[in-house]
């Protein structure tokens, strides 16, 4: 007669099976303090941040879509830009304004490039859900990309031409509200009073031009922005003046 002991599973796991990683409840806290205290290397910070973005992708996208829909319905600047885009036979709404996770891009020289959104003539606007802080941030990003869309419909912008791109970046940074004094003061710790708006627009336009792969370096980015600055900064269309 066979013993019932032979049917019991072994007490010791099979050593040939690959062991699964164990959940460490303290890892998040330790990583957070490492970043706060500056002991985590920058390359590890990027990996940690990207891992967190991937883990929370659905939450971030759902929240981004709520903020997008709210601004499409209630934001004066977004509604105004929607109307002016329609007047040029364009259409931007929830169907082609999409919230997506945007991974950090590492350049050949090791620099990190992050973005809040982007415009494509073929696909519409992408909002980087993992970079959006709140509804106001979504509003500014939407307005910025809508200026690009309006420029493209109005002037058929050649986005491969750095001068064309620089002009639209100047206008988008100036007209969207992202360079208003309150945002510079509270978000970016820029406490200057005089020339604050112009300095912000120039800085952000240079940064956007530099992020394009075909821009050689910051010297070229600054030169291109300076070449088109006067005419593009003073052009507030479709607004009568700088809105914010």
From Swiss-Prot:
One Pfam family linked to the record: Peptidase_M76
Main location, first listed in the record: mitochondrion
Binding site for a divalent metal cation: 144, 148
Active-site residues per Swiss-Prot or TrEMBL entry: 145
InterPro entries, sorted: Peptidase_M76_ATP23 (IPR019165)
Region (Disordered): 1-25
Membrane-protein topology: Peripheral membrane protein
Gene Ontology terms for molecular function: metal ion binding; metalloendopeptidase activity
Keyword terms: Hydrolase, Membrane, Metal-binding, Metalloprotease, Mitochondrion, Mitochondrion inner membrane, Protease
EC number(s) recorded for this UniProt protein: 3.4.24.-
GO biological processes: mitochondrial protein processing; mitochondrial proton-transporting ATP synthase complex assembly
Function recorded in the entry: Has a dual role in the assembly of mitochondrial ATPase. Acts as a protease that removes N-terminal residues of mitochondrial ATPase CF(0) subunit 6 at the intermembrane space side. Also involved in the correct assembly of the membrane-embedded ATPase CF(0) particle, probably mediating association of subunit 6 with the subunit 9 ring.
Family designation: Belongs to the peptidase M76 family.
Full protein name: Mitochondrial inner membrane protease atp23
Species this chain originates from: Botryotinia fuckeliana (strain B05.10) (Noble rot fungus)
Encoding gene per record: atp23
């Amino acid at each position: 007669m066979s013993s019932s002991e032979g049917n019991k599973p072994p007490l010791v796991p099979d050593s040939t099976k690959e062991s699964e990683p164990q959940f460490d409840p303290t890892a998040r806290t330790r990583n957070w303090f490492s970043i706060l205290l500056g002991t985590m290397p920058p390359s590890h910070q990027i990996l940690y941040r990207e891992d967190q973005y991937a883990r929370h992708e659905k939450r971030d996208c759902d929240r981004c879509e709520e903020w997008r829909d709210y601004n499409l319905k209630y934001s004066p600047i977004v509604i105004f830009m929607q109307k002016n885009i329609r007047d040029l036979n364009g259409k931007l709404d929830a169907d082609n304004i999409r919230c997506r996770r945007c991974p950090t891009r590492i350049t050949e020289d090791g620099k990190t490039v992050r973005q809040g959104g982007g415009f494509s003539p073929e696909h519409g606007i992408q909002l980087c859900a993992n970079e959006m802080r709140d509804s106001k941030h979504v509003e500014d990003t939407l307005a910025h990309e809508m200026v690009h869309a309006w420029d493209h419909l109005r002037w058929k912008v050649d986005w491969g031409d750095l001068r064309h791109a620089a002009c639209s970046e100047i206008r988008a940074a100036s007209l969207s509200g992202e360079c208003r004094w309150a945002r510079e003061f509270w978000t970016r710790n820029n406490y200057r009073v005089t020339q604050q708006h112009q300095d912000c627009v120039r800085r952000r336009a240079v940064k956007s031009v530099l992020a394009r792969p075909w821009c050689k370096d910051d010297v070229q980015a600054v030169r291109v922005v300076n070449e088109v600055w006067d005419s593009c900064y003073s052009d507030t269309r479709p607004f009568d003046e700088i809105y914010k």
